[in-house]
């Protein structure tokens, strides 16, 4: 903390020195314009504009920029102080549904030795499925979310108390258990599984053909 304060004070001091140097440069510019114009005290509008812009730059460096730097340091400090053990909010209904469906599709495609779907295809399938699920299925996801929020609020209170009294806090493994919902189990096989299983049919036929050919060869080879 002391190092941060020292470096900040050094930065502020440097900015003030820069401000003073810029002011001196502006005054020197005015004197230069006077000499260049033959010693006349008259300064043109363009010259005054150039000096004004220089002074505005000084003001920005000495005040606004310092405030921005301090705000940036404060923001970085808040990010660094975020505790990874702090309880995390549960997934919303849609994101929990998305998690479940992604897991279901991944399992089905892995069983069939199929490559993963592209992000576009996966997101499109998830959106279509979410738009078509029944109110009862959505109610099931809402209940899961509400139950998870109850646990989250309890854990959040425990965590805040541990910060006050200095006691240890041990977060639960997961506030929201990522299990596949009943709605996906019931309806997924009717439509999405067709996408998963259809490319597999040629493989099955090929395996049967290979077995028949092996039997024929073994039959010819026997006396």
Curated annotation (Swiss-Prot):
Signal peptide: none annotated. Keywords: DNA-binding, Nucleus, Transcription, Transcription regulation. PANTHER family: HIGH MOBILITY GROUP PROTEIN DSP1 (PTHR48112), MITOCHONDRIAL TRANSCRIPTION FACTOR A, ISOFORM B (PTHR48112:SF22). The keyword Ligase does not apply. Residues 204-223 have a biased composition (Basic residues). It comes from the Eukaryota. One of its GO terms (cellular component) is rDNA heterochromatin. Coiled coil: none annotated. Residues 87-160 bind DNA. Induction: Repressed hyphae and in biofilm. This is Transcriptional regulator HMO1. InterPro entries: HMG_box_dom, HMG_box_dom_sf, HMGB. GO terms for biological process: chromatin remodeling; DNA topological change; filamentous growth of a population of unicellular organisms; negative regulation of G1/S transition of mitotic cell cycle; nucleophagy; positive regulation of double-strand break repair via nonhomologous end joining; rDNA chromatin condensation; regulation of ribosomal protein gene transcription by RNA polymerase II. Residues 69-89, 165-223 are annotated as: Disordered. Residues 70-86 have a biased composition (Basic and acidic residues). Transcription factor that binds upstream of hexose and ergosterol metabolism, as well as cell cycle genes. Activates pseudohyphal growth. It is found in: Nucleus. It comes from Candida albicans (strain SC5314 / ATCC MYA-2876). Its main location: nucleus. GO terms for molecular function: DNA binding, bending; double-stranded DNA binding; four-way junction DNA binding; sequence-specific DNA binding. The keyword Transcription applies.
């Amino acid at each position: 903390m002391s190092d941060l304060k020292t470096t900040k004070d050094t930065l502020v001091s440097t900015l003030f020195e820069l401000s003073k140097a810029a002011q001196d440069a502006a005054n020197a510019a005015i004197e230069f314009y006077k000499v260049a114009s033959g010693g006349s005290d008259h300064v043109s509008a363009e010259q005054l504009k150039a000096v004004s812009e220089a002074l505005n730059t000084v003001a920005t460096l000495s005040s606004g920029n310092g405030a921005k730097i301090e705000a940036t340091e404060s923001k970085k400090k808040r990010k660094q102080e975020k505790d990874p053990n702090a309880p995390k909010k549960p997934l919303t209904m849609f994101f929990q549904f998305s998690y479940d469906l992604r897991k279901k599709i991944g399992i089905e495609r892995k069983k069939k030795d199929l490559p993963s779907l592209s992000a576009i295809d996966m997101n499109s399938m998830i959106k279509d499925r979410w738009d078509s699920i029944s109110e009862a299925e959505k109610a099931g996801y809402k209940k899961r979310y509400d139950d998870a929020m109850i646990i989250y609020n309890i854990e959040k209170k425990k965590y805040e108390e541990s910060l006050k009294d200095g006691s240890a806090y041990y977060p639960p493994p997961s506030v929201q258990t990522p299990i596949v919902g009943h709605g996906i189990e019931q309806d997924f096989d009717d439509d999405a599984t067709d996408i998963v299983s259809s490319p597999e049919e040629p493989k099955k036929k090929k395996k049967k053909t290979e077995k028949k050919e092996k039997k024929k060869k073994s039959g010819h080879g026997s006396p």
